[in-house]
Amino acid sequence: MKLLIMGPPGAGKGTQAKILAKKFNLVHLSTGDILRKEIDKSSEVGLKAQTYMNAGNLVPDEVLLEMMQSTLTELKDSGVILDGFPRTIPQAIGLSKIFQSLNKAIDSIINIEVDKEVLIARLVQRAKNSGRADDTEEVIVNRQNVYEELTAPLIEF
């Protein structure tokens, strides 16, 4: 089984993905985990990603897709749930090509919808609990706006 779980920051994607992974014996994949794994392995693609991250830049789609290709190839015969990936239409197109190259298909896409005010309140509380001073309400609202601009259009894709 190949699942995607999508939704805005604070919607509970990671929480729900963990529950589904356990219930259906799936490998839970998040972009952050994949990045860390590739960097820890000092793989070529991991080192590329680390260069961008160390400079404070976003990791480009082509690097993320290269990582995803490597990871999904390793797990091609396993059930997986992708948490929060893809985030953009180019990533979705690339992911579709990866699955085609593996002769696999996405079985289902789960989109979690939560009221924006609830999301902001959750993330503000989470920031307070984690002690992250950089997660201000302004930053949180900006992340929601970026999601609406770049990721929400995937729902129609």
Predicted regions: what they are:
Residues 1-157:
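Glycine-rich phosphate-binding loop of ATP-dependent small-molecule kinases
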